[in-house]
Amino acid sequence: SSAASDVYKRQSLIGKNLDEFSDLCSELGVEDFRSKQLFNWMYRNEVSDLTELKNLPKSLIGDLKRGHCIHPLELINSTNSSSEKTNKFLFKTQSGALIESVLMNEKNRVTLCISTQVGCALDCKFCATAKMGFKENLSVGEILDQYLLARQKINKPITNIVFMGMGEPFLNYKNVIKAAKLLNDPNGINLSLIHISEPTRPVMI
């Protein structure tokens, strides 16, 4: 729809760190303490629309609406395996590409496998993604939003993150590291680094 495409032209708030929210508040001419409020809304609360940010002035909400959206991804579909041990999530990116995340329900933990690229440049014979070739790197927001939207959908804590979905994390290193830091931030999602892993294939650079 035209409304959906309009949203994709806006810059997502998810993916920004506290310094970037501070810069945004400066650009919009509002007090710096609003940056912490925005950060908390994005990563500690499950919000889908800017009108849900109740402690922010309406003037700021209006300014944000003109150039920003909350989520960079759209959840297209989610399916459960017959045993309910796995959930598969299909997302649409801001460029219109489709990516997947897989949730694994185990006895003492819930692990989400997150994609880091659309397609992959490596030709691993065991991997179906290799047949796509490399399309694009996911943004920090698109990496993080897989976690946030999956958590919202299943309505229970996700204890572990593995960057083992579509793509090679090492080839999108900067965005993956920034996403991991935001996942770990004690003022936000607060997921221990012990529970965040980045399996990688050998890469010649």
What are the roles of these predicted feature ranges?
Residues 5-110:
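Flexible, acidic/Gly-rich N-terminal and inter-domain linker regions that tether
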Residues 97-197, 201:
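Conserved Radical SAM active-site core
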